[in-house]
């Protein structure tokens, strides 16, 4: 029976880096992890709450707008540096957005003596990120677009990015069928067993009227 491992954890320390950079005493380690989780959830909730709503916009701009690829947290003695990597930082560029976010985050920080420093970093090639493609597919499926058409459109978007291979899998009650199944589409190379191959991965749940669908995306970026 095949054993499947998370592609990101499998390559941690080689082609993938940690998203949290700090040290703590063993007795305080769990508190640091909980604090990181609260900070990340607070940022994602803020983005989701303030995301622009409108049904007349283009699918590409709506589905990919303000999608966070990952959040880096660096802790020093008196400062917590939070670096938000985002596809299209239109929302966070608004006047007063960073200050409002800092106030929300300060409530989640354990120590009142530590100050927050938030930095926004735009992703150079958004459609190279599996999180953004997963959000795009979710937007398509929620608008009753066929799942096969949604997967093909997502792969077409990756033509703008410099990647070597991609695989998209959707599992669940596809097209409202009573029996759940999985469908996948693949293009290019995807060497999952090669550790030096830089592969980005994303697992994303989508809530539809027929139930929850699971989307998994593997992207082969380059080989180091």
Swiss-Prot record:
Quaternary structure and interacting proteins, as annotated: Part of the 30S ribosomal subunit.
Family statement: Belongs to the universal ribosomal protein uS3 family.
Pfam families xref list: Ribosomal_S3_C
Residue stretches making up the KH type-2 domain: 43-124
Transmembrane segments: none
PROSITE patterns found in the cross-reference section: RIBOSOMAL_S3
GO biological process: one example: translation
One GO cellular component term noted in the UniProt record for this chain: chloroplast
Source organism superkingdom: Eukaryota
Residue ranges that the Swiss-Prot or TrEMBL entry lists as coiled coil: none
Single annotated GO MF: structural constituent of ribosome
The protein, known as: Small ribosomal subunit protein uS3c
Disulfide bond entries: none
Protein localization: Plastid, Chloroplast
Alphabetic keyword roster: Chloroplast, Plastid, Ribonucleoprotein, Ribosomal protein, RNA-binding, rRNA-binding
